[in-house]
Amino acid sequence: MRCLLCQCGEKMSGFTTITEGEYFEETEKRSRFISYSFPVNSEIEAMKFLKQIKTKYPDARHHVYGYVINGFSEKYSDDGEPSGTGGLPIINAIKSMNLSNVLVVVVRYFGGILLGTGGLRKMYGSGALNVLNLSKKVKLTLCIRMCVNVDYHNYSKILSMLSKNGAKIISTDYLGDIKLELLVRKESSNDVIKKFSDILKNNECVQILSNEYCVV
C-alpha cells in the first residue's frame, strides 16, 4: 500500500498522480524536445528534479517545466522561450489529464529553425502529453491513520466492522490487549470511530495519528 503524508493546509478528498518518472523524445525541424515526468510532493522536490535535468543537459538552450501540487498549487517557467509558449502548455497538459503532484520538464536543443509561437506551444504541449501518457498512474484517497486497543472478546466484531467499512489494517500487536493500527477513508472515519466507541463502550478508544493519501 502506497501512502503519502498529507502536509497541505487544504485537503482534497483524493487525486490521481503518477507512480514513477518517464521519458519521451521527439524532433521538430531539427529541434530536439526531451520530456521527463516526475511524481513530486513539494516545490523543494520539484526543484531538485529540475536541477538534475539541468545538470544532465547543461548545453541545452531551454529547460522548460511545469508542476501541479495538491491540486491547486502550480508553477511553470518558459525558461527563455516566448511568454506562454512552454510552461503553460505543460500545465494545461497536466490539468487536461486531471493529474496532481506531477512535474514535467521539457528540454529543448535548438535546431536552427524557428518554430514560431504556435509551433512551440504545440511541441511543449505534445511532449508533456506524451510523457504523461507513458507514465503509470494511481488514484490516492485521503485517509486517516489511527490506532485502537481492542479486547479479545470484541475482536471479531471489530474485524467485521472494519471489513464492512473498507478499512485497512496496517499492523496488529497482540501484547496485552490487541493494538490495531489502520487506515480509514476520511469520508467514513467518523462512522468508524463511532462504531469503535459503541462496540468497545469507550468514547476515547481511538487515537488519530495522521492524515495521509493512500491507495485503498
Located regions from the model:
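Terminal, non-globular segments
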Residues: 182-191
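Active-site beta-strand/loop microenvironment that shapes enzyme catalytic pockets
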Residues: 86-134
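Short glycine-/aliphatic-rich beta-strand segments at the starts of folded cytosolic domains
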Residues: 136-152
